Amino acid sequence: MVFARKRFGQNFLHDRSVIAHIIEAINPKPGDPIVEIGPGRGALTEDLLQAAGELDAIEIDRDLAADLQQRFGDRGLHLHVTDALRFDFAALAETKGRRLRIIGNLPYNISTPLLFHLLKTPAAILDLHIMLQREVIERICAEAGSSEYGRLTVMLAPWVEAEHLFDVGPGAFRPAPEVWSAVARLTVRQEPAFA
């Protein structure tokens, strides 16, 4: 068994009802060009593979990657053992011939830089379904004038239409984080929208 590593900010999702809720929100279809960032122990991976038929996954932890490859390598998993902050999403979208659907229970310690890395090439990304610390999701999805509205909201709003889908308690993870999480859908605009 592979244990969570603090340096990678790992908390593994294990709650089947939360997993089902996330899969329902994503609504993956056969042939969707799905990329899972940080699949960890594969909590979402199996259901995503079953729905889409194939899946690209980016995992930085070599031990987890080896386990994922052993379990899903012959079932349509295309594993990239690398740092998502250095991954070329535009090249993958070009190879697939379609805009990517990004899924991720993102490590909280790299979430903001990763979002900006993804949005450097908005034409490559269709949407993102992400789980982050609840306070970060609230800031991403904030309405102008609310107490959560701030720099992150302003920087992302031109590029995404953000929707806070649902909250996830600490008990859904092992080890349990000290904070609540939330899932959001970010629909990416190919051109920025300015108010």
Segments and roles (model prediction):
Residues 1-195:
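Catalytic cores of RNA-modifying enzymes
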